[in-house]
Amino acid sequence: MLDTSIQELINKWQQYLILQKNYSHHTVVSYNNDLKHFLEFMHYYNSDLVTINHIKTADIRLIRSWLAKRNCNNFTTSSISRGLSAVKNFYKFLEKTTQLNSHIIFSIKSPKKTKLLPKSLSEDDVVISLKHIEEYGNVKWVELRNKALLVLIYATGLRISEALSITKLHLQNLEFIRIIGKGSKERIIPWLPIVKNLITQYLEILPYKLGENEPIFRGKQGKKLQPTVFNRELIKLKRFYGLPEHLTAHSFRHSFASHLLEHGADLRSIQELLGHKSLSTTQNYTKTSIKHLVSVYTSAYPIKK
Protein backbone atom coordinates (compact mmCIF):
# COMPACT_ATOMS: atom_id res chain seq x y z
CA MET A 1 0.00 0.00 0.00
CA LEU A 2 2.82 2.42 0.94
CA ASP A 3 6.12 3.03 -0.72
CA THR A 4 8.96 2.32 1.75
CA SER A 5 10.12 5.93 1.58
CA ILE A 6 6.70 7.05 2.87
CA GLN A 7 6.94 4.80 5.92
CA GLU A 8 10.38 6.25 6.65
CA LEU A 9 8.90 9.77 6.51
CA ILE A 10 6.09 8.74 8.85
CA ASN A 11 8.61 7.35 11.35
CA LYS A 12 10.61 10.60 11.23
CA TRP A 13 7.40 12.61 11.65
CA GLN A 14 6.48 10.63 14.76
CA GLN A 15 9.92 11.23 16.25
CA TYR A 16 9.56 14.93 15.46
CA LEU A 17 6.22 15.09 17.28
CA ILE A 18 7.63 13.33 20.35
CA LEU A 19 11.09 14.89 20.62
CA GLN A 20 10.59 18.40 19.25
CA LYS A 21 6.90 19.13 19.65
CA ASN A 22 6.61 17.26 22.96
CA TYR A 23 3.29 15.66 21.97
CA SER A 24 1.90 13.00 24.29
CA HIS A 25 2.07 9.34 23.36
CA HIS A 26 -1.73 9.28 23.09
CA THR A 27 -1.76 12.20 20.62
CA VAL A 28 0.99 10.70 18.48
CA VAL A 29 -0.85 7.36 18.28
CA SER A 30 -4.11 9.13 17.37
CA TYR A 31 -2.38 11.26 14.72
CA ASN A 32 -0.65 8.21 13.28
CA ASN A 33 -3.97 6.34 13.00
CA ASP A 34 -5.60 9.33 11.31
CA LEU A 35 -2.77 9.62 8.79
CA LYS A 36 -2.92 5.87 8.18
CA HIS A 37 -6.64 6.15 7.35
CA PHE A 38 -5.94 9.04 5.01
CA LEU A 39 -3.21 7.13 3.15
CA GLU A 40 -5.39 4.02 2.94
CA PHE A 41 -8.09 6.15 1.35
CA MET A 42 -5.50 7.62 -1.04
CA HIS A 43 -4.46 4.08 -2.01
CA TYR A 44 -8.11 3.15 -2.64
CA TYR A 45 -8.74 6.44 -4.50
CA ASN A 46 -5.74 6.06 -6.83
CA SER A 47 -5.77 2.24 -7.03
CA ASP A 48 -2.01 2.34 -6.77
CA LEU A 49 0.92 2.14 -4.35
CA VAL A 50 1.07 5.45 -2.46
CA THR A 51 4.25 7.35 -3.27
CA ILE A 52 5.58 10.75 -2.25
CA ASN A 53 4.32 12.06 -5.57
CA HIS A 54 0.75 11.00 -4.72
CA ILE A 55 1.02 12.89 -1.43
CA LYS A 56 2.42 16.00 -3.11
CA THR A 57 -0.25 16.05 -5.81
CA ALA A 58 -3.27 15.17 -3.63
CA ASP A 59 -5.96 17.61 -4.72
CA ILE A 60 -8.84 19.19 -2.85
CA ARG A 61 -11.33 16.70 -4.29
CA LEU A 62 -9.46 13.75 -2.81
CA ILE A 63 -9.16 15.40 0.59
CA ARG A 64 -12.83 16.42 0.70
CA SER A 65 -13.84 12.91 -0.42
CA TRP A 66 -11.87 11.47 2.49
CA LEU A 67 -13.57 13.84 4.95
CA ALA A 68 -16.97 13.00 3.47
CA LYS A 69 -16.27 9.27 3.82
CA ARG A 70 -15.44 9.76 7.49
CA ASN A 71 -18.65 11.66 7.94
CA CYS A 72 -20.63 8.85 6.27
CA ASN A 73 -18.91 6.36 8.57
CA ASN A 74 -20.37 8.25 11.55
CA PHE A 75 -17.14 9.78 12.80
CA THR A 76 -17.89 12.60 15.23
CA THR A 77 -17.17 16.18 14.20
CA SER A 78 -14.33 16.22 16.73
CA SER A 79 -12.79 13.08 15.22
CA ILE A 80 -13.05 14.48 11.69
CA SER A 81 -11.43 17.74 12.81
CA ARG A 82 -8.64 15.90 14.59
CA GLY A 83 -8.04 13.73 11.51
CA LEU A 84 -7.69 16.79 9.30
CA SER A 85 -5.34 18.37 11.86
CA ALA A 86 -3.20 15.23 11.87
CA VAL A 87 -2.86 15.16 8.08
CA LYS A 88 -2.13 18.90 8.00
CA ASN A 89 0.53 18.33 10.62
CA PHE A 90 2.16 15.68 8.45
CA TYR A 91 2.10 17.99 5.43
CA LYS A 92 3.60 20.78 7.53
CA PHE A 93 6.39 18.40 8.52
CA LEU A 94 7.00 17.64 4.84
CA GLU A 95 7.20 21.38 4.16
CA LYS A 96 9.66 21.79 7.02
CA THR A 97 11.86 19.00 5.67
CA THR A 98 11.70 20.48 2.15
CA GLN A 99 9.71 17.56 0.76
CA LEU A 100 7.11 19.89 -0.76
CA ASN A 101 6.00 23.49 -1.05
CA SER A 102 2.75 25.00 0.19
CA HIS A 103 -0.15 22.58 -0.26
CA ILE A 104 -3.88 23.01 -0.93
CA ILE A 105 -4.72 21.10 2.27
CA PHE A 106 -3.95 24.17 4.36
CA SER A 107 -6.86 26.03 2.77
CA ILE A 108 -9.38 23.47 4.04
CA LYS A 109 -11.10 24.52 7.25
CA SER A 110 -12.06 22.04 9.93
CA PRO A 111 -15.80 21.36 10.26
CA LYS A 112 -17.50 23.35 12.99
CA LYS A 113 -17.95 21.32 16.11
CA THR A 114 -21.55 20.57 16.93
CA LYS A 115 -22.50 22.25 20.16
CA LEU A 116 -24.37 19.64 22.13
CA LEU A 117 -27.14 20.82 24.39
CA PRO A 118 -26.92 19.58 27.95
CA LYS A 119 -29.40 16.83 28.72
CA SER A 120 -32.45 17.82 30.70
CA LEU A 121 -33.43 16.19 33.98
CA SER A 122 -36.72 14.43 34.63
CA GLU A 123 -39.22 16.33 36.77
CA ASP A 124 -38.74 13.69 39.48
CA ASP A 125 -34.98 14.34 39.52
CA VAL A 126 -35.64 18.07 39.77
CA VAL A 127 -38.05 17.60 42.69
CA ILE A 128 -35.51 15.40 44.53
CA SER A 129 -32.79 17.99 43.91
CA LEU A 130 -34.87 20.92 45.14
CA LYS A 131 -36.01 18.96 48.17
CA HIS A 132 -32.56 17.85 49.31
CA ILE A 133 -30.16 20.61 48.18
CA GLU A 134 -30.55 22.24 51.61
CA GLU A 135 -28.80 19.27 53.19
CA TYR A 136 -25.47 20.56 51.89
CA GLY A 137 -23.84 23.64 53.33
CA ASN A 138 -23.38 23.01 57.09
CA VAL A 139 -24.57 26.54 57.88
CA LYS A 140 -28.23 27.52 57.72
CA TRP A 141 -27.75 30.56 55.48
CA VAL A 142 -25.57 28.55 53.05
CA GLU A 143 -28.19 25.79 52.91
CA LEU A 144 -30.90 28.34 52.16
CA ARG A 145 -28.63 30.04 49.61
CA ASN A 146 -28.17 26.75 47.76
CA LYS A 147 -31.90 26.12 47.59
CA ALA A 148 -32.75 29.69 46.58
CA LEU A 149 -30.13 29.64 43.82
CA LEU A 150 -31.17 26.27 42.43
CA VAL A 151 -34.86 27.18 42.44
CA LEU A 152 -33.99 30.51 40.79
CA ILE A 153 -32.16 28.80 37.92
CA TYR A 154 -34.86 26.19 37.38
CA ALA A 155 -37.71 28.70 37.70
CA THR A 156 -36.21 31.30 35.36
CA GLY A 157 -33.84 29.45 33.01
CA LEU A 158 -31.02 31.82 33.91
CA ARG A 159 -27.45 30.88 33.09
CA ILE A 160 -25.43 30.27 36.26
CA SER A 161 -23.39 33.41 35.53
CA GLU A 162 -26.59 35.45 35.23
CA ALA A 163 -28.07 34.00 38.42
CA LEU A 164 -24.90 34.77 40.37
CA SER A 165 -25.07 38.37 39.16
CA ILE A 166 -28.54 39.03 40.62
CA THR A 167 -28.53 42.06 42.93
CA LYS A 168 -31.06 43.64 45.30
CA LEU A 169 -32.01 46.00 42.49
CA HIS A 170 -33.32 43.04 40.50
CA LEU A 171 -35.71 42.26 43.36
CA GLN A 172 -37.44 45.63 43.36
CA ASN A 173 -39.90 44.77 40.60
CA LEU A 174 -42.59 42.48 41.97
CA GLU A 175 -43.68 41.04 38.62
CA PHE A 176 -40.62 40.30 36.53
CA ILE A 177 -36.83 40.35 36.38
CA ARG A 178 -34.97 42.14 33.61
CA ILE A 179 -31.80 40.36 32.46
CA ILE A 180 -29.09 41.55 30.08
CA GLY A 181 -27.56 38.32 28.81
CA LYS A 182 -25.06 37.25 26.17
CA GLY A 183 -24.52 39.71 23.36
CA SER A 184 -26.25 42.39 25.45
CA LYS A 185 -29.60 40.77 24.67
CA GLU A 186 -32.34 41.84 27.02
CA ARG A 187 -35.06 39.56 28.25
CA ILE A 188 -37.85 39.75 30.78
CA ILE A 189 -38.68 36.79 33.02
CA PRO A 190 -41.67 36.64 35.38
CA TRP A 191 -41.02 36.10 39.06
CA LEU A 192 -42.70 33.10 40.65
CA PRO A 193 -43.67 33.63 44.32
CA ILE A 194 -41.62 30.61 45.44
CA VAL A 195 -38.46 32.20 44.01
CA LYS A 196 -38.89 35.60 45.64
CA ASN A 197 -39.91 34.03 48.95
CA LEU A 198 -36.82 31.82 49.09
CA ILE A 199 -34.49 34.68 48.16
CA THR A 200 -36.12 36.92 50.79
CA GLN A 201 -35.68 34.22 53.46
CA TYR A 202 -32.05 33.78 52.44
CA LEU A 203 -31.31 37.51 52.57
CA GLU A 204 -32.89 37.80 56.01
CA ILE A 205 -30.28 35.47 57.53
CA LEU A 206 -27.31 36.32 55.27
CA PRO A 207 -24.56 37.45 57.70
CA TYR A 208 -23.13 40.03 55.28
CA LYS A 209 -24.42 43.50 54.51
CA LEU A 210 -24.80 44.15 50.80
CA GLY A 211 -25.20 47.26 48.70
CA GLU A 212 -28.01 47.55 46.19
CA ASN A 213 -25.69 46.73 43.28
CA GLU A 214 -23.81 43.84 44.88
CA PRO A 215 -24.58 40.24 43.85
CA ILE A 216 -26.73 38.63 46.55
CA PHE A 217 -25.32 35.11 46.38
CA ARG A 218 -22.18 34.99 48.53
CA GLY A 219 -19.55 32.43 49.42
CA LYS A 220 -18.75 31.50 53.02
CA GLN A 221 -16.11 34.24 53.22
CA GLY A 222 -18.54 36.88 51.99
CA LYS A 223 -17.21 37.16 48.46
CA LYS A 224 -19.34 36.66 45.34
CA LEU A 225 -20.22 32.98 44.96
CA GLN A 226 -18.37 31.24 42.12
CA PRO A 227 -20.01 28.70 39.75
CA THR A 228 -17.44 26.02 40.60
CA VAL A 229 -18.29 26.24 44.30
CA PHE A 230 -22.01 25.78 43.64
CA ASN A 231 -21.42 22.92 41.20
CA ARG A 232 -19.40 21.15 43.90
CA GLU A 233 -22.51 21.22 46.08
CA LEU A 234 -24.47 19.65 43.22
CA ILE A 235 -21.84 16.91 42.84
CA LYS A 236 -22.38 15.92 46.49
CA LEU A 237 -26.13 15.92 45.92
CA LYS A 238 -26.12 13.74 42.81
CA ARG A 239 -23.67 11.23 44.28
CA PHE A 240 -25.62 10.74 47.50
CA TYR A 241 -29.02 10.41 45.83
CA GLY A 242 -27.87 8.60 42.69
CA LEU A 243 -28.99 11.41 40.41
CA PRO A 244 -27.93 11.57 36.72
CA GLU A 245 -24.26 12.25 36.05
CA HIS A 246 -25.14 15.17 33.76
CA LEU A 247 -26.76 17.07 36.65
CA THR A 248 -25.11 20.51 36.78
CA ALA A 249 -26.35 24.04 37.33
CA HIS A 250 -26.71 24.41 33.55
CA SER A 251 -28.79 21.24 33.27
CA PHE A 252 -31.50 23.00 35.33
CA ARG A 253 -31.61 25.81 32.76
CA HIS A 254 -32.11 23.23 30.03
CA SER A 255 -34.71 21.39 32.14
CA PHE A 256 -36.57 24.68 32.60
CA ALA A 257 -37.05 24.91 28.83
CA SER A 258 -37.79 21.21 28.29
CA HIS A 259 -40.40 21.04 31.04
CA LEU A 260 -42.14 24.22 29.90
CA LEU A 261 -42.38 22.75 26.41
CA GLU A 262 -43.75 19.49 27.79
CA HIS A 263 -46.38 21.43 29.75
CA GLY A 264 -47.66 23.24 26.68
CA ALA A 265 -45.67 26.47 26.48
CA ASP A 266 -45.01 27.64 22.91
CA LEU A 267 -41.49 27.63 21.51
CA ARG A 268 -41.47 31.38 20.83
CA SER A 269 -42.12 32.21 24.48
CA ILE A 270 -39.48 29.75 25.64
CA GLN A 271 -36.91 31.28 23.27
CA GLU A 272 -37.67 34.69 24.73
CA LEU A 273 -37.33 33.44 28.29
CA LEU A 274 -34.00 31.78 27.51
CA GLY A 275 -32.65 34.85 25.76
CA HIS A 276 -32.09 33.11 22.44
CA LYS A 277 -33.94 35.89 20.60
CA SER A 278 -33.51 39.65 20.97
CA LEU A 279 -36.26 41.49 22.80
CA SER A 280 -37.11 45.15 22.59
CA THR A 281 -36.08 47.36 25.47
CA THR A 282 -38.37 47.37 28.49
CA GLN A 283 -39.86 50.70 27.44
CA ASN A 284 -40.92 49.30 24.08
CA TYR A 285 -42.21 46.10 25.61
CA THR A 286 -45.96 46.72 25.81
CA LYS A 287 -48.00 45.81 28.88
CA THR A 288 -49.96 43.38 26.73
CA SER A 289 -46.75 41.57 25.73
CA ILE A 290 -45.60 41.31 29.33
CA LYS A 291 -49.00 40.06 30.50
CA HIS A 292 -49.03 37.44 27.72
CA LEU A 293 -45.54 36.25 28.64
CA VAL A 294 -46.47 36.04 32.33
CA SER A 295 -49.67 34.16 31.47
CA VAL A 296 -47.90 31.58 29.29
CA TYR A 297 -45.14 31.13 31.83
CA THR A 298 -47.21 30.79 35.00
CA SER A 299 -49.81 28.50 33.43
CA ALA A 300 -47.23 26.12 31.97
CA TYR A 301 -44.56 26.08 34.66
CA PRO A 302 -44.41 22.78 36.58
CA ILE A 303 -43.61 24.32 39.98
CA LYS A 304 -45.99 27.14 40.75
CA LYS A 305 -46.42 26.81 44.51
From Swiss-Prot:
User: Which GO BP terms apply?
Assistant: cell division; chromosome segregation; DNA transposition
The Gene Ontology CC terms held by the record are:
cytoplasm
User: Where's it mainly located?
Assistant: cytoplasm
Q: Which GO terms describe its molecular function?
A: DNA binding; tyrosine-based site-specific recombinase activity
| Natural source organism | Rickettsia canadensis (strain McKiel)
Specify the protein name.
Tyrosine recombinase XerC
Give start and end of each Tyr recombinase domain: 116-298
Q: Which residues form the Core-binding (CB) domain?
A: 4-95
